[in-house]
């Protein structure tokens, strides 16, 4: 579960390395899960890339440490909290996605992120 002040790693090559969640988008929501959109501040970034430190960006959560339960009864859990930066059209800002992503992203219409990911769990 991601909430305000949570630090996340960035799972794409947009230039950002660490994010801090500012807000979970939605009507008065406290927690974000896989597939939810958050507003975050860039805390660490590579030089000469598309984003800079202290930029405010939108991102979609692709991995969480909290257990994710599926309707089939399966549950999965990742080793880190990670997000992918997106633009206003909900397309990824980077051209590559690193690490596995959850299948729930396809149901939330983030098909571009799913197609860029090396593994879908």
Swiss-Prot record:
GO CC annotation terms, alphabetical: cytosolic large ribosomal subunit
Record's keyword terms, sorted: Ribonucleoprotein, Ribosomal protein, RNA-binding, rRNA-binding
Gene Ontology MF term list: large ribosomal subunit rRNA binding; structural constituent of ribosome
GO BP terms in the entry: translation
CDD domains: Ribosomal_uL14
Described function: Binds to 23S rRNA. Forms part of two intersubunit bridges in the 70S ribosome.
Subunit structure: Part of the 50S ribosomal subunit. Forms a cluster with proteins L3 and L19. In the 70S ribosome, L14 and L19 interact and together make contacts with the 16S rRNA in bridges B5 and B8.
Family in the record: Belongs to the universal ribosomal protein uL14 family.
Protein name: Large ribosomal subunit protein uL14
